[in-house]
A protein has these predicted regions:
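Glycan-recognition and catalytic cores of secretory/periplasmic carbohydrate-active enzymes
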Residues: 1-167
Length: 167
């Protein structure tokens, strides 16, 4: 491969990344409740206001990671914080060993809880990345707490899982 091809490929990748990130910033952010809407069509129209909890964590992580890689942009940092705050406030089932829900309503009411740990994993890495950017110790603490929950996942009482969530 020649240098010109690699430079063009790099330019194309950056353009695609910008399109994707701007799509989510423009259409996905929930300015009323926090977090992001996760059910959008290709035009950015919301077709369900239910929110995937693991996607809240994934967006919280990716926006903080973008700050780590490309430099801090306030809108990226704010988007990450919005997702993390939404998760901390609404997405942790305090009555089930701090396990996270899988799906919640737009305003954070629980809809479904699963037995696997995707929500916890993304919340953990999102807090770690956010802490790395901001130095805000509470996010380090949240990440450690969540990591400990995630490590114990196979041993947690699964009786807390709503049977209807397996439908």
């Amino acid at each position: 491969m020649n240098k010109e091809f690699l430079l063009e490929a790099q330019k194309w990748a950056k353009e695609e990344l910008d399109i994707c990130i701007n799509f989510w910033l423009k259409n996905g952010l929930d300015k009323e409740n926090g977090g992001v809407y996760t059910c959008l069509d290709r035009e950015g129209k919301i077709y369900s206001t239910d929110k995937s909890v693991w996607m809240q964590g994934r967006c919280g992580w990716i926006f903080a990671y973008l700050c780590h890689v490309y430099g801090v942009k306030e809108e990226w940092l704010a988007a990450s914080k919005s997702c993390l705050d939404f998760m901390e406030k609404y997405c942790i089932n305090r009555e089930c060993g701090d396990r996270m829900y899988f799906t919640v309503t737009a305003d954070g009411k629980p809809l479904r809880q699963r037995r696997y740990c995707y929500s916890e994993a993304f919340y953990c890495i999102a807090n770690a990345e956010y802490y790395g950017i901001t130095g805000e110790k509470e996010h380090l603490d949240f990440g450690i707490r969540d990591h400990n929950v995630e490590i114990l996942c196979p041993f947690l009482n699964t009786a807390c899982v709503d049977v209807r969530s397996r439908e």
